[in-house]
């Protein structure tokens, strides 16, 4: 399981897909369902439903089942545990990575998979941060601008060492605490 922070949105997934694809092709990225309709990349995606979607609970259970089956077959799962792009709390503040979802801890613990943390540096533009404070629709519209803007910039994610399973196992009784630890560990990579 590869866990990563999510400061840029779509760009983060594109970079991880490129890096992993150089080594192996049995990876799947947990991503919003609107991205899974692109035929050329469909095989590398597992859709994560938006909470407001019809049958969101059923779709969420299906997503978890697919992810666990893929892991049990020896595949790689890529997940952005915050589930959202990092954003500033004010118009001019720094982007902050949201709390990480305890579902990731449960998936890690149930699967027994090796965990590799990845940290992306930087953040989306100030325009994006301001749009985020004004309107979700405006924010979403600017995400494509951010992708185009990022294409011409070098990206250098920091890939951490695989985590010692005993460190994760020591936190098995507290999934939320496990994710706080894993988030801090990932954001601390340098």
Predicted segment positions?
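Catalytic core of membrane glycerolipid acyltransferases/transacylases, capturing the structured
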Residues: 4-56
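Non-catalytic C-terminal accessory region of glycerolipid acyltransferases
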Residues: 60-190
């Amino acid at each position: 399981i590869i866990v990563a922070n999510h400061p840029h949105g779509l760009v983060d997934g594109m970079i991880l897909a490129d890096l992993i694809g150089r080594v192996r092709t049995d990876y799947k990225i947990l991503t919003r369902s609107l991205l899974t309709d692109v035929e050329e990349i469909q095989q590398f995606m597992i859709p994560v439903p938006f909470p407001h979607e019809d049958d969101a609970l059923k779709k969420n259970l299906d997503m978890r089942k697919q992810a666990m089956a893929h892991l049990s077959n020896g595949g790689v799962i890529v997940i952005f545990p915050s589930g959202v792009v990092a954003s500033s709390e004010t118009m001019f503040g720094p982007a902050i990575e949201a709390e990480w979802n305890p579902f990731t801890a449960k998936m890690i613990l149930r699967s027994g998979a090796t965990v590799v943390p990845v940290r992306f540096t930087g953040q989306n533009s100030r325009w994006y941060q301001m749009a985020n404070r004004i309107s979700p629709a405006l924010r979403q519209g600017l995400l494509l601008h951010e992708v185009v803007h990022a294409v011409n910039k070098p990206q250098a994610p920091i890939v951490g060492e695989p985590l010692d399973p005993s460190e994760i196992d020591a936190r098995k009784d507290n999934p939320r605490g496990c994710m706080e630890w894993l988030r801090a560990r990932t954001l601390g990579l340098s």
